């Protein structure tokens, strides 16, 4: 077996493994907890890194098409994770010095959290559509 055949075999094995895990979890996305979604986001990063590592042995057009279905999912999941982090940060800020927090602080915190929660609902709807598109996309490494 020459080096390019060995590299392709390695890549196919890794890509199939990561893709199987991502697809299995994507099918359960609507029922996942925030922690499970965060873990899915990390698994998707592993798939993306594997794709990046193996990309040069496949036609660019096929790789890019697959990456284009994965990219918006990662962006939206990242945003949803940021919303959770912001909520925790605001909560921590307000509880750190309860006597120093003025009504204006609570009002501002409510506006910030409310705005992000509204955006998160829209983002989540788009995320579900993106996931369905991803699940319908054929893996480029399975093409002959």
Spans of model-derived segments:
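Cationic, histidine-enriched alpha-helical/coil surfaces that engage anionic ligands
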Residues: 1-144
């Amino acid at each position: 077996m020459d080096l390019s055949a060995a590299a392709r075999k390695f890549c196919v094995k890794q890509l199939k493994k990561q893709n199987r895990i991502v697809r299995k979890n994507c099918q359960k996305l609507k029922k996942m907890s925030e922690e499970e979604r965060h873990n899915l986001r990390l698994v998707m990063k592993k798939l993306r890194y594997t794709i990046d590592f193996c990309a040069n042995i496949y036609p660019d057009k096929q790789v890019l098409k697959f990456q284009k279905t994965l990219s918006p999912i990662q962006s939206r999941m990242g945003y949803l994770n940021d919303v959770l982090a912001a909520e925790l940060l605001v909560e921590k800020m307000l509880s750190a010095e309860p006597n120093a927090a003025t009504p204006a602080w609570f009002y501002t915190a409510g506006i910030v959290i409310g705005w992000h929660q509204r955006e998160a609902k829209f983002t989540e709807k788009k995320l579900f559509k993106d996931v369905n598109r991803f699940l319908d996309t054929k893996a480029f490494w399975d093409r002959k």
